[in-house]
């Protein structure tokens, strides 16, 4: 950083006497002698040929220009076998042998056989085993789930029976069928097609109403739990160990891949300082586990890590490692940590790139693990906050208001057989290593290979092994950020959709707990419900058109309700409002809860109620668009379209008109065709039934663009609408994250790969953190020379991703390129 003038003078002087092609063949020692000449102006070369002296005065002196205190720490920089400087960015490896268990998946017939003959099978299996007694919470959970199922089935059956009584096609005239059979078989098809269509409508309605009913009863029991505060089986209410055992240490893992570096390290620093304030920092280590392959981001990560260590007062508990082989993506990154350092820790907390957790929350999770020795995973509930676009504000408001209701309800039905969401959760490492390492799904095609939505599967395997999985729904201090706009959320949804479809292959997995089979099923249904809703609406429209054509001469249908004969108007209105009530009651429960406690956090009662109305309106606008996209995702997956996953945006990015029109043009066309069919074949009044859906599809590009604007989001914020407690009374961790994010942006490293070659300090950092540390070999040296020739011919700008990573990983190539390119430029 300093003595740049001397540096340039030296380069200019040296360039006159030496050719560039000769420099690439210079030895590592000679180049560092040149570098020492730059710093000191000394020409006593023999003195600097000593190995130890050279490595100390070259890389270390350059690094001292930027991070003097940190570089002076003992054992921060060591030397490898070839005396090349090496920064100890991670601890000594303490390897554990881990291996994934091959999948044993039953066929449907063998699964049904085991299910129906469970008693006989259990008698055979338990001859030489001790009888397992169920814990109290397990018995209570079984009873609750049977009640849950009875409530849903009864409610759904009544609603379907009502719909059947409303639909027009009921009695089949068999005598007329025989008459038609003698005439023409096509007349029979024409006669029976409305009845077959109506059966499909009833089946779809039963499935979809079952889904709505399950959601309602989950919200209802969550409301009961939160309003009474009498949850005997809430894991966070149990007796908690006050002191953590000294040998029970926790690793906080942040797996990242090409993320927004400034935001990642801002959140990490806020989390670290929050732990520091609890006085329990000695029980925690932080690991940044990078899978990044963008070399600019890789270099920025290294700089941000060393900055973080320097700013927090380096005490040797913040580590950084970047993998060279990206096997199994995020789950493989965590497996790699467990293999290398899992022995050193009792627990690990997984964070996402946008996660923030308070020190109190982390200490509480560790204490819960200490108090519940059979708990394998405890999931905290991350609260969405931190974005300002209209869509993000809508998203974080709805999850903040309705989320507690549904998570408490899920806990009521699942208890210790719950699932985990892949981040902001604590995991017991030993059983995780033993039972939860995932092998790729067998076979070919897009539903085979590495599992994408690994979190649900890991929770299922943990429970299968006899360890409980809990949701700690009432622990504060866990945060994440929502997607900034609609299209970004849909990109994330596509990956989740694909992952849930892959997971469903494990539905018949041997030994899986019934609750986790249901979790896999609900995971699929959360996306499959979209095409089912779409099919239900389309078939209902077709059925109404057929009915209108057939009975146009008999009487005029004068109704606002589709597939409803005029004579059944009262029954249809009743069913319509019952369905609407089931959809809106969870929102009403949330309103009661918040107003009864403290609505000031949401801007006061008046602003809160207006925000609820606004949220309902926005949901009506966004839901049809999501329905169409989820339908496309399902079809794309089944037709074999591959999926490429990129890290989501972590800032308030708006959607461009070009991107919006390109993404939504299909929905616009479908909306226009749908409205034309209704107007042409039905009545204009019938259009009002479908109006919210069709109108949303037609104007979807406008919705997508305007909902991504920060200005519109801030206007609502200034009026006190869509406020959440984290905005009204922001916790210290969120305040610090925003503060450090601004600081990080001001000192962010741009064009990191070129800086690693050209800039003296960043080159020294890249050299000291390069991972390719091979012993001397003629073949390696020869390949290195060939690669340097290739770089000089192609130029840095034209190197591909793999070539750039090769450069960044090799300390000798980095050193030679540093001198070659600077001399060439001068």
UniProtKB/Swiss-Prot annotation:
Which residues lie in coiled coils? none
Q: Which UniProt keywords apply?
A: Cell inner membrane, Cell membrane, Glycosyltransferase, Membrane, Transferase, Transmembrane, Transmembrane helix
Q: Where in the cell is it found?
A: Cell inner membrane
Record keyword Cytoplasm present: no
One of its Pfam families is Glycos_transf_2
Bilayer topology annotation: Multi-pass membrane protein
Associated pathway: Glycan metabolism; osmoregulated periplasmic glucan (OPG) biosynthesis
If you read the UniProt record, what top EC class would you report for this enzyme, in one word?
transferase
Task: Name the residues that span the membrane.
Answer: 137-159, 174-192, 199-221, 518-540, 547-569, 573-595, 602-624, 628-645, 665-684, 688-710
Q: Its biological function?
A: Involved in the biosynthesis of osmoregulated periplasmic glucans (OPGs).
The UniProt family comment states: Belongs to the glycosyltransferase 2 family. OpgH subfamily.
Q: What is the protein's given name?
A: Glucans biosynthesis glucosyltransferase H
Question: What is the native source organism of this protein?
Answer: Wigglesworthia glossinidia brevipalpis
Q: Which gene encodes it?
A: mdoH
């Amino acid at each position: 950083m300093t003595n740049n003038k001397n540096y340039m003078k030296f380069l200019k002087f040296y360039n006159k006497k030496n050719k560039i092609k000769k420099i690439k063949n210079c030895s590592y020692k000679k180049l560092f002698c040149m570098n020492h000449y730059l710093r000191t102006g000394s020409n006593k070369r023999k003195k600097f040929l000593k190995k130890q002296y050279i490595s100390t005065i070259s890389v270390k002196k350059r690094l001292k220009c930027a991070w003097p205190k940190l570089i002076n720490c003992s054992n921060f920089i060591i030397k490898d076998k070839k005396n090349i400087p090496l920064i100890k960015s991670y601890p000594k490896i303490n390897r554990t042998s881990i291996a994934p268990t091959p999948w044993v998946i039953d066929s449907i017939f063998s699964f049904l056989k085991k299910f129906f003959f469970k008693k006989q099978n259990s008698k055979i299996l338990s001859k030489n085993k001790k009888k397992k007694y169920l814990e109290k919470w397990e018995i209570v959970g079984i009873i609750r789930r049977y009640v849950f199922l009875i409530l849903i089935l009864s409610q759904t059956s009544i609603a379907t029976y009502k719909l059947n009584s409303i639909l027009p096609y009921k009695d089949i005239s068999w005598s007329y069928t025989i008459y038609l059979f003698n005439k023409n078989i096509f007349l029979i098809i024409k006669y029976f097609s409305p009845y077959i269509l109506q059966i499909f409508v009833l089946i779809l309605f039963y499935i979809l109403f079952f889904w709505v009913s399950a959601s309602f009863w989950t919200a209802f029991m969550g409301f009961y739990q939160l309003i009474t505060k009498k949850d005997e089986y809430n894991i966070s209410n149990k007796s908690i160990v006050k002191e953590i055992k000294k040998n029970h240490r926790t690793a906080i893992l942040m797996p990242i891949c090409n993320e927004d570096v400034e935001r990642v390290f801002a959140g990490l620093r806020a989390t670290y300082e929050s732990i520091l304030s609890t006085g329990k920092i000695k029980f925690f280590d932080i690991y940044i586990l990078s899978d990044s392959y963008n070399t600019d981001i890789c270099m920025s990560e290294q700089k941000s890590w060393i900055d973080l260590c320097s700013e927090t007062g380096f005490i040797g508990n913040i580590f950084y490692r970047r993998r060279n082989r990206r096997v199994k993506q995020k789950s493989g990154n965590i497996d790699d940590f467990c293999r290398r350092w899992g022995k050193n820790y009792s627990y690990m907390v997984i964070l996402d790139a946008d996660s923030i957790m308070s020190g109190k929350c982390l200490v509480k999770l560790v204490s819960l693990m200490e108090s519940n020795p059979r708990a394998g995973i405890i999931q905290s509930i991350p609260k969405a906050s931190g974005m300002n676009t209209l869509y993000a504000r809508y998203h974080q408001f709805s999850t903040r208001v309705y989320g507690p209701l549904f998570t408490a309800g899920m806990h009521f039905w699942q208890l210790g057989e719950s699932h985990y969401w892949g981040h902001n959760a604590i995991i017991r490492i030993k059983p995780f290593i033993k039972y939860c390492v995932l092998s790729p799904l067998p076979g070919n095609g897009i539903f085979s290979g590495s599992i994408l939505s690994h979190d649900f599967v890991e929770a299922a395997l943990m429970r299968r092994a006899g360890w409980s999985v809990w949701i700690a729904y009432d622990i504060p201090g866990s945060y994440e950020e929502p997607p900034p706009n609609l299209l970004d959320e849909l990109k994330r949804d596509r990956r989740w959709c694909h992952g849930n479809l892959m997971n469903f292959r494990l539905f018949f997995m041997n030994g899986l707990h019934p609750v986790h089979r249901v979790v896999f099923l609900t995971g699929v249904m959360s996306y499959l419900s979209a095409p089912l809703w779409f099919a239900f609406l389309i078939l209902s429209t077709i059925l109404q058109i057929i009915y209108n054509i057939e009975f146009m001469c008999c009487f005029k249908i004068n109704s606002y309700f589709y597939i409803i004969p005029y004579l059944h108007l009262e029954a249809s209105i009743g069913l319509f409002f019952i369905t609407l009530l089931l959809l809106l009651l969870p929102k009403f429960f949330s309103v009661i809860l918040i107003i009864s406690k403290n609505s000031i956090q949401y801007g006061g009662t008046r602003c809160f109620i207006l925000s609820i109305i606004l949220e309902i309106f926005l949901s009506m606008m966004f839901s049809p668009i999501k329905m169409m996209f989820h339908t496309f995702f399902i079809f794309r997956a089944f037709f074999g379209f591959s999926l490429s996953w990129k890290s989501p945006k972590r800032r308030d990015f708006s959607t461009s008109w070009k991107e919006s029109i390109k993404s939504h043009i299909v929905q616009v066309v479908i909306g226009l065709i749908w409205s034309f069919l209704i107007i042409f074949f039905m009545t204009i009044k019938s259009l009002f039934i479908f109006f919210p859906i069709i109108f949303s599809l037609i104007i979807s590009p406008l919705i997508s663009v305007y909902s991504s604007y920060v200005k519109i989001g801030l206007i609502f914020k200034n009026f006190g609408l869509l406020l959440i407690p984290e905005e009204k009374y922001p916790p210290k961790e969120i305040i610090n994250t925003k503060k450090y994010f601004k600081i990080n942006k001001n000192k962010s490293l741009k064009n990191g790969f070129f800086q690693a070659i050209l800039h003296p300090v960043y080159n020294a950092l890249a050299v000291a953190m390069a991972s390719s540390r091979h012993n001397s070999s003629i073949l390696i040296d020869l390949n290195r020379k060939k690669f340097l020739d290739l770089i000089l011919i192609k130029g840095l700008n034209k190197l591909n991703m793999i070539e750039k990573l090769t450069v960044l990983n090799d300390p000798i190539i980095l050193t030679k390129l540093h001198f070659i390119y600077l001399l060439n430029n001068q």
